[in-house]
Amino acid sequence: MLHKKYRPNVAAIIMSPDYPNTCEVFIAERIDIEGAWQFPQGGIDEGETPLEALHRELLEEIGTNEIEILAQYPRWIAYDFPSNMEHKFYAFDGQKQRYFLVRLKHANNIDLNKHTPEFRAYQFIHLKDLLKKIVPFKRQVYRQVIAYFKRDGYL
């Protein structure tokens, strides 16, 4: 059996500024794959902590890192890239992620074009509608992380 290689990565479940009064999460549609909606996420650079990577990735991807950190998933969680996907990260079989639950402080600060755009559109959607919008190969990870934050009373 071959040893799989996973790219270290952070991901953010971003609650709207109205949280906890409204339970809506931020998702964005990838610019390179039409219809592929997901949470913001990105690689951890060498020497960077997951928290540092989170702030950098949010600034790069959504134009703001003005967030309040609510909780962190306690373990790394991995997923494999689908076999039919062109591997942007061909040296890796998938990604291992550290998830953060955060609240966005100001929705009007979102700017998908602040850096090199990775997303074409974004929306805040109710948690119950989330999995219908997400690419299938990420759904199990999303289910697991959402269930954890629900059990802990955050969602």
Curated annotation (Swiss-Prot):
Residues forming the Nudix hydrolase domain are 5-147
Record PROSITE patterns: NUDIX, NUDIX_BOX
By its UniProt entry, which SUPFAM superfamilies does this protein fall under? Nudix
Its GO CC terms are: cytoplasm
Write out the similarity annotation: Belongs to the Nudix hydrolase family. RppH subfamily.
Q: What does this protein do?
A: Accelerates the degradation of transcripts by removing pyrophosphate from the 5'-end of triphosphorylated RNA, leading to a more labile monophosphorylated state that can stimulate subsequent ribonuclease cleavage.
NCBIfam families according to UniProt: PRK00714.1-3 (NF001936), PRK00714.1-5 (NF001938)
Under which name does UniProt file this protein?
RNA pyrophosphohydrolase
Biological source species: Helicobacter pylori (strain G27)
